[in-house]
Every structure is written in structure tokens, then in C-alpha cells.
Amino acid sequence: SLKWTADKYFVTTEEEPLFDAADVLRFGKDLIVQHGFTTNLKGIDWLRRHFKDHNIHTVNFPGDPYPIHIDATFSPLKPGLIINNPDRRLPDDQREFFKKNDWEIIDAARPAHNSPPPLCYSSVWLSMNVLVLDPKTVCVEASETNQMEQLDKLGFEVVPVPFRDAYAFGGGLHCATADVFREGKCENLSLIHI
């Protein structure tokens, strides 16, 4: 139930560290980690111990009945701008942290589809599972017209990529790619340790 998610009552225990890389977003030297079904608090502590040069921030989304894979719920587009699944909103107290650090969180556009494709058990919110190439360029699944339109209005160059047939393998564009190697150094994107 959503009450269990809001109360952070998950099926996982705290016996052993557990985390899924898909529950982690990199914001330069800051890592945003979703506490949920596939990442427990011991796993988050493990990340803190092993990534001492990064700030680790824990988030949760009470509107998500199955909190796994943060990239269909919360996605940074460029420094200062994040899209959030409007059905799984970041709680106000956690939003305040981003607001204080000059990050705007906006609702993602509604998915163009009412159901996933055949053999896919992922959420229709793979619509917001985008691949950011740089602060001006975003790859979006080609049939997700609502998301493409929103990003275009936000000033991004939108690159449509036909990828819906791959959803049955469990993810979208962000899930199916490794980190993009970028020129320059890893930046501190103005998030502070809380």
C-alpha cells in the first residue's frame, strides 16, 4: 500500500547491505539514492563508506507503490532542472533541499501510452527515462510525444530514438546506457551535504 511506502516499510530487511545502481543518480559529486524495495539503509551506508569523495543524499517517493529504479520517477535534465513523476512526487521536505540549492523540480509530461508494450512489465513512466547527452541535448523514446514536446518547450534539442520495442527487457534509454564520458572534470553541482 502507499501508506507502507510513505512509512518506508519495505520488503527488504537491514540484515545485509543491498543497493541497485538503478536507484542512484549522479549529480556531479552528489549521489541521489532512492531508499526502497531494492536499496536498503545498509546499502546506502555502504555507498557512503566507499564513495567518501561524494555526498550521498537519500530520497523516497511515497506515491510509488513499488519503489525501484529512480529514473522513471526523478531525472536531472541539466544543472538546476529536474523532472519528477507527478504520480510519485518528492515530498515537500525533500523538495526544500533542492530548492535551497537552486534546483527547480517540475512535473514530467504524462506518458503518451496508457499501457506498456507487450511482454513489458515496466511502468508507462519509462516515458521520462531519457538520456541526457549535454545540458542542451536529450534523447527521448520516439513515440513519447508528450515528453518530447515538454523538453522542446524547455529549450532542449530533442533526439527521438525508437526504443519502445526494447522496453520488454526492463528499461528505457537511461537504463540501457552506461555513463557518458564527458570532457572536463566531474563538477560539484551545488548540492550540499544534508
Predicted regions and their residues:
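The feature marks the mature, well-folded catalytic cores of soluble enzymes
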Residues: S1-L191
